[in-house]
Design a protein with these regions (language model features):
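Short, solvent-exposed alpha-helical "recognition" segments
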Residues: 42-49
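Short Lys/Arg-enriched helix C-cap and helix-to-coil transition segments
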Residues: 49-55
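Amphipathic alpha-helical dimerization/coiled-coil segments
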Residues: 77-79
Length: 79
């Protein structure tokens, strides 16, 4: 039996949720498939969501937040 969990959607994203597929995540981050999945496993990259029986995607705002955090780290803003 499938277990459903209610996930609150932040108000700012309620009507602008965009799901990215792997090719789009690779293009946006400049990273390879293997490095993306290695970092997901290590907890260093956002996890994908299931969008079908054999398909996953990433929420664009989560990927963008990850990119923003990397920029801040590289410029000494976050430690």
């Amino acid at each position: 039996m499938t277990k459903h969990v209610a996930v609150p959607i932040p108000e700012v994203h309620r009507y602008s949720l965009v799901i990215l597929r792997l090719a789009q995540v690779k293009a946006r981050t400049g990273r390879s498939r293997s490095s993306i999945y290695a970092d997901i496993k290590a907890g260093r990259f956002v996890a994908p969501i299931n969008i079908g029986p054999r398909a996953v995607g990433w929420l664009a705002h989560e990927v963008d937040e990850w990119i923003t955090a990397r920029i801040a780290e590289s410029r000494g803003g976050a430690r």
